[in-house]
Amino acid sequence: MLLQLLQADLAAGLLAFSFGGTHGGATVSSVGPTAPVGHNGAMALIVQKYGGTSVADAERLRAVAEHIAFTHRQGNQLIVVVSAMGKETDHLIALANEVSRTQPGRELDMLLTAGERKSMALLCMALADLGIEAVSLTGSQAGIITDTTHGKARILEVKGDRIRDALAAGTVCVVAGFQGVSTAKEITTLGRGGSDTTAVALAAALGADTCEIYTDVTGVFSADPRIVPTARKLHRVSFEEMLEMASAGGRVLALRSVEFARNHNVPLHVRSSFTWEPGTWVTSEEPGMEDPVISGVTHDISEAKVTVTNVPDRPGISAALFEPLADANVIVDMIVQNTSKDGTTDISFTVPKADMSTAERIVAEVAKEIGAGGVDHDDNIAKVSLVGAGMKTSPGIAAKMFRVLADEDVNIEMISTSTIRISCVVAASDMQRAVRALHTAFGLDSGSMYSAPLPERR
């Protein structure tokens, strides 16, 4: 059934984008039954990434295999990156917690990478059943070289020799996302969202014509449709806007994958695994186009606030506080320092809740060393943000945002800005009300309820 849906949509002439091998300007063409054309008239090299919901069970794996088979039969070279099936990673983490309170990073990475190896092997079996020659490769086998940080490794290099050889032989390469091998020859994981980063890194290293990110939504929306049912789908978003959305809590794309795509100018197409309508293109900003003032409202409930009170106000104190956090790979987001009074000040900042125990331990030690008054934390917060490339040339956005929140009786605890984003920390209990009010106030409601039912599967 899914194959018929895809063929029908293609025959109807859905729009696709063809990009040059250097990821240059995009041209729009009507897609028919012929193969998409890559750079220099050759067959296209496409990287497709399928998330956990897309490969959650045997039925969905077979559906993904049909999609891959159809795309491959159109003459395309394909690299497919897969996540672990469904909640497999969460299950493995829970299992580790049952077994041990102390989990060495090396062993945890060895455990967690098993999820992607399972899904890649099963997908290759499903492809073989359709007559498609495919080979599964772990991150190590695919040549993804990382630093030595377990759990949050960063990609240093993609060799990709085995992938090139397989593609030259007409084979579909199915690569395990989320993982690589360190310079010390140890298995590493890239952290949450690492499969997105794997896909973009492969696309950049191998000169892919495009990178398709398949997920459980039909694209990037102006807000989370679960909170704002009238959120509208964005047909195009710039790398800069997507970076701000991802850093402000948008869950469609992982932040590091967008950074990689922007740095290497890899065009991304975010679309649903369950419907065949066009999704959202994430590309470099097009000259001559007037940007919308506000593209979206995002929220993030994954952070906690730490406040260090009565900090001595003298040079070097901030460095003494934040350098140990950086050394421990704790990402600090928003930072606010109060005006000095009586030679002391308060410093508040936000960190991921997942890093809270590490941050608390480090900050408590530093607070004693520098003679601060104490350390407080609050994990019942949410970050609500406005994002829009047109914001930098439109005055009054911050004032309007603050007025809307005030009218909703939402108290603002912290504020941070960039040229195209304004973020406010509010109480977690106020988050949904704040998002809905801002979405309406800035004219983002589509007027129709979001609905994306799964297609019938046979």
What are these regions (language model features)?
Residues S18, H23, T27-H39:
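Short, positively charged and aromatic/hydrophobic N-terminal segments
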Residues P278-R458:
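A conserved regulatory-domain signal marking ACT and ACT-like small-molecule sensing domains
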Residues V82-T89, V270-E286, F349:
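Terminal amphipathic helices with adjacent charged low-complexity linkers/tails
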